[in-house]
Amino acid sequence: MKFFRTLFLAFAVFFAFAAQAADKVYPVSVKINESISTDDRGTKYDDPLAAALKDANLGEIVGGGNSVNKAGKIEWAGIDLEVTDLQKSIPVIKQKLIDLGAPKGSTIEYHSGGKKVVVPVQ
């Protein structure tokens, strides 16, 4: 009986860790090198990018904003994502941004192995 109890506990611990790993999300930031309003960014980038991530079951958009200079001009737009698999998500995000016409200087940023990784879109 002790053997089965130990075996049961081992399986319970294994499945608890497996479920926890499945729920892991990774933050990713996209910097779009374009002066674009929040509404226009949503239409041009956010909505299609969200659909691509959802279709691939890789994550979602969780926020965004614009960087504004002292004169009040938008310098660049940002999109915040949470993805479930960095290896699969980054190529999907990059290709979608290329397809959507993200300009040169746009980047995808995330952390891996304790280091910041910056991937140019173009």
Predicted regions and their residues:
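Bacterial N-terminal signal peptides that target proteins for export
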Residues: 1-8
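Bacterial N-terminal signal peptides
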Residues: 8-16
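Long, contiguous binding/interaction regions
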Residues: 22-80, 84-122
